[in-house]
């Protein structure tokens, strides 16, 4: 099944030690064809961006960068594996690694949140 990420909102539900996002970080995804990008902010993140592609197996291959509330700039790469959960929401299982401004690697989970009505 192919997932359309356009206009989906996600929030982190778990993250490894050394990761900067938390349950206050909100991600806003966009998509055009196989191109995917997002902005994110909240928690310790003042503002961040991601850009990448949807691979043939459905995983997302992303590069990210953000500015923290303390003014630090960090970046890295992430591979996200989607899972469709209740009410057709999407959960992304992420493996990430810092490539700039930080050290280490980890895993996180972000889940789609439905907009308030």
What are these regions (language model features)?
Residues 1-21, 92-98:
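Tryptophan-anchored aromatic micro-motifs
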Residues 11-12, 36-39, 60-64, 90-95:
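Short hydrophobic/aromatic-rich beta-strand segments that constitute the beta-sheet cores
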Residues 11-21, 38-45, 69-73:
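Short, solvent-exposed secondary-structure boundary motifs
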Residues 21-25, 45-50, 73-79, 91, ...:
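Short, surface-exposed coil-to-beta transition loops
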Residues 24-26, 54, 97-117:
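Edge beta-strand at a domain terminus
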Residues 25-53:
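N-terminal glycine/threonine-rich, aromatic-flanked beta-hairpin/loop signature
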Residues 42-47, 66-70, 95-102:
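Short, solvent-exposed aromatic-acidic interface loops
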Residues 54-91:
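Mid-chain, well-packed structural core segment of small domains
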């Amino acid at each position: 099944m192919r997932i359309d990420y356009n206009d989906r909102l996600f929030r982190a539900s778990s993250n490894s030690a050394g990761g900067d996002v938390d349950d206050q970080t909100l991600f806003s995804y966009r998509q055009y064809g196989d191109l995917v990008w997002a902005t994110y902010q909240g928690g310790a993140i003042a503002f961040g961006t991601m850009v990448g592609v949807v691979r043939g197996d459905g995983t997302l291959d992303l590069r990210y960068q953000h500015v923290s509330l303390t003014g630090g700039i960090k970046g890295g790469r992430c591979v996200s594996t989607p899972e469709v959960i209740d009410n057709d929401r999407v959960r992304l299982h992420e493996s990430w690694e810092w490539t700039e401004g930080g050290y280490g690697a980890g895993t996180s989970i972000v889940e789609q949140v439905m907009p308030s009505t």
